[in-house]
Structures are given as C-alpha cells and as structure tokens.
Amino acid sequence: MEESGKMRRCCQDICALWHYESYATMSGENKKRKEKFMIKAEKLSYSFPQKDLYNKISFTLEDDVHCAFIGTNGTGKSTLVDMILHPDNYLYDGRLIVDVPGRIGYVSQFYSLDEEKEVTVFDYLSEEFVRLQNEINTICDEMATADELDELMDRYQNVMDQFQAIDGDFYESNIRKQLKIANLKDYENHLLTNLSGGEFKLIQVIREMMISPKFIIMDEPDVFLDFEHLNALKNLINSHKGTLLVITHNRYLLNHCFNKILHLENAELQEFDGTYVDYNFALLEMKIEQQELAAADMEEIERNRKIVERLRNEATKVDSATKGRSLKARVSLLERLEARKTKSPFVDIKQSQIELHTSAKSSDDVQGDVSGQTDADETTSEERTEQNHEKVILEVENYSVAFDRQIMEEVTFSMEAGEKVAIVGPNGTGKTTILRDIYKNNNPAIKLAPDLKVAYLSQMHGEVFDERETVLKNFEDAGFETDAEIVRYLETYGFEEELVYNKVENLSGGEKNQLQLAKISRMDADFLLLDEPTSHLDTYSQLALEQAIEKYEGAVLMVSHDFYTVANCMDYVLFVEEKKLRKMSIRKFRKMIYADHFDKNYLELEQKKKELENRISFALQAGKFE
C-alpha cells in the first residue's frame, strides 16, 4: 500500500515535470492560437422553404468582444446562433468560419431543473472541474502500473490543458467570486431544487462562464428575470473577460452592457462597433439621410413621370417611330427609378400595429364598469383617476396564497376603471398566481365588477392557444368571417401570410406573445390582465405595446419586470414587500430604480437622445431638415 502511494506520487511528479516542459514549449503556439480566435461570416445566405433568412450577410466576432444581437421577432437570430453551434447541420451559401479554442458555451432561454438532482449550488458549479480532476487522478493511477507511458502522457496533457484553460487550479475561489458578483454569495450551500427560476438562470450563466470562458452565446438570458436578478446578470456580463454573443431585447441590458452590435433585419445584417446608445444615434442619422435621399428620388421620379405623360400625349397625336422609342426609353427609366427608391432594412422596419379596445359601454350600462372616455390621447392618468372615482372594478380583500411556504398573506387592494397598475417584485412572490386567480374569479377574497369583460395574457402560451394547431385555426373563434380577414388582420401584427399556416408551437417566443396580443385586441375587453407582456418581444414591439397601453381606455393590471414599460405606462405600482402589496407612485418607483441601478452619465445621455429623437421625429413629419 505504501509502495503504491510512493509510485503514484512519483508518477504525478513525472507528469507534472512533463507537463511543465510541454506547457512551456506550447506557450508560443497558444498565443498564436489566441490571435486566431474568431467567428466570421462572409456573404452568408440561408433560406427556409417559405422565407429567406439571410442574404449575403457578413460579420466578425473577435477576442473579448461583448456583442448584442438584436432584430425584430422572427428574423432568424436563434437560427444563426444554432448555425454557429452546429454548422454541419445546415446547407448555406457563402462562408462561416468558427475558429474557437475549447468549448463554445451556450445559455438557453429555458432550462428545466432536474428535480431529482439533490446537489448544492457549489457542487453543481464544481462538477466539470471535479470530473477533470478525477480523470487526471485516474490517468496517474494507470501510469503507476503501465509499461508504455506515451499514450497516457498524451491523455494527461490533453486533460490538463482543458483543466488549465478553465483556470481549474483556482476554481473554488472563482466560484465564490462569481456568486458574489451575482449577489448570490450566501447560496453556495443551497440545494438547486430550492432556487427560484431567476436564481437558477444566474447559476447557469455562471456555470457557462466558468467552463467556457473564451466564447459564450446567450439566447435571451434575461427572460422573466426580476430586476434584482437582471442587475446581477448585467454585472456578470460586464465582468466577463471572454467573448459574448447575446440575443436580447432587454433595454436595460442593451443600455448598460455591450461594445458591439449585430442588427439583423429583412434578411440583411448590420455590424456596429460601439454601444447600443451610440448605435441608436447612428440609426437616427441614417433615418435623416434616408429621408433626404428619398426626397431627391421622388423629385426625379416626378420629373420623369411628367416627361412620360407628355411623350404619351404627343405619341397619340403623331405616329412617329422616334417618339415611340423615346417614350419606351423614358418608361424604362421611370421603372428603374421606382425600383431603386432609397430603402434601408434597418430603418424601414415593419412594426406591429398593436391596438387595444374596450367594449365601449357607458358607465351606466354596468355598475362599476369602465367609463366611456372618447379621447385617451388627451387624458392624463390623473384626469382618468378623477373621472373614474368610485367606479371600482376590482376588490381584493385579505387574499393569501401558499405552496410549500406562505407567499402572500392578507393582501388587500382595489382598482378603479381606467387605472393602469403594475405588480412588481422578486421572482416567486405570487405575482402570477394572484393575476391568474383574478382572471378565474373563483376566490372569495376577489371581487370583480358585474359583467366586466376581462382578457388575460399568460406567460404560458399553452393556456391560451392549442400549440399543435396552426395560427389560422387558433383565430377561427376570434370573430372573423373568412380566412382572408384573419390573414390581413395578423399582417398588422407582423405576421407574413405563410406564418399564418404554421403551427403555433413552431413560432418564436416573441411571435407567440404577439399572437396573444393580437387575440386580446379582438376581445374588446374592459380590463386587461397582462403577465410579463414584453417578454420575448423585440424593442419595436415593446414600444408599440407601450403606446397601445397608453391609448387604451380600459383598466390594466400588469405583472412586469420591465422598468421602461412600468415607468412609461403605469399610473402606480403595487410593490411586493414582506408578503404584502405596497402602493408606490411611479415617481418614487423611478427614483428607487435609478438610485440603485442606473448610472448618472447614462441617464443624461439617454435624455439627450430622447430630445434628439423628438426633434428628428417632428422634422420627419414636417419634411424640414435644417
């Protein structure tokens, strides 16, 4: 036994010496390889049977870039990510170079926690490091009795390289450091099964950052994260030393992370080196330039149209071959001018036209029902509240909910017609549960006004749609007379005709949310219950939804972690605190979030950007560019 221990220690010493010499000779090669790191696409084209996704797109990702990948829902962002991860699974034109040392990390939108995996957070994050350590020890054990060491030495070197590449010698301290950055430093001994969904998502991000430090792809890692966890995700992203490619529509992350932007629209891709705020300024400049070019194009088109009309008139009076040739040439030129009208795939974006309507009943028709306002655009939230005073549509009194523990306890609040209210708080505090119970209206602690028409947007799309059926089939009960009407209606929500014949289960998360909004719009409800309505939605659709909510004359109760939507649309907030709901003004809510999470310089820059956007918007409407 003692002799075996000596042999093993001797073998480990030999391995260490061999590894040291090999590692020293390889250091130059590793530096060269580091310089080679890249993801590069050159004139890449790819199509689905019903849609062109990419038309000769090109981009490059190199060392230590933190890149945001943006674009409207359904443009093919997730497909491009999958092409990078599994290029051999796709038939495409052009070139796609994936030259990344080591494993490519991937954080999915969704993770299913193995309920039977009773391990602590620390042990879960240690798994890959422990596996490699055990493999190294096994090789050393085999060396103690092996006659030939060359193959074992190669195996040892390979495993040791993997271990060193992920900083394995310091993995325990690195785990604790990452947990601290994510504000989870007290969680290392917690069981995975006891974590909330947001906490588990952060653990997944930490895990990938530790075992795939060179390059990580994240597909909407922010979905359903509460604001504290979103801020933790921001800190993890900003502290990471490797390259990141992150699909996100989250405006908080976009405004506070990333030094490169990839923007995919209309089968084309634009690459921008700089921050998201800088990119938005560039888009505004592009919009002005496009407007000026479009004005010049229209002037030239109009001039040639008049020439064509004159030549046609002359041709009817005089039968001349010369006149005929001149007319034909001018018509051809006019067609070319029409075809080449200045377009920009990153400015001319087909945006959703979200509209929300009430049943338009007067307040006399139903006791406690929504008042019949006629001009929401000119009515402030304060005026709405005053007009609807004492028209209570919802009363919640001593509402409690518990699962394995008490979540909400004796919650009491009420809402009046026309009010727009957000429930805000950490994950796992019962927000979705109370919203669902209000919709079901079968809890004695909840009272809705008689005959109030209520619509509900769920996080779980399967609660609303039969996902195995087509989009068209799911809208047959929405009050349309023909399939053609359904197609035309859904086009206003960004759905091209071919998508209408797809099964709902094949749509992206953002498209499913758009579909729910389209269906809710047809219901003409007086009271909207919206559970995370901006999740998965692209930024353009988020803004369209905000405008629709502002114009909507009915009442809204919304669960959301999106600061911008809450701050821009709501009258006040119900903040989850100590199992109660505390009423908070929007001004106080803004101040609380700004103080804790927003950089002052960013806020000043954002304000300047808004002022510039407003000036440009007015100039575009007036046609003035001075």
State what each model feature region is.
Residues 327, 344-383:
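Amphipathic heptad-repeat alpha-helical coiled-coil/stalk segments that mediate oligomerization
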Residues 307-313, 617-620:
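Short E/K-rich amphipathic alpha-helical oligomerization segments
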Residues 8, 13-15, 19-290, 365-626:
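ABC ATP-binding cassette signature C-motif
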Residues 283-311, 327-341:
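Intracellular alpha-helical coupling/juxtamembrane segments of multi-pass membrane proteins
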Residues 3-6:
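Extreme N-terminal basic, low-complexity initiation segments
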Residues 337-348, 447:
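Proline-centered turn/helix-capping motifs that create local helix->coil transitions or kinks
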Residues 312-324, 342:
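Short intracellular "coupling" helices and adjacent cytoplasmic loop segments at the cytosolic face
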Residues 153-157, 321-328:
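Short, charged, amphipathic alpha-helical segments
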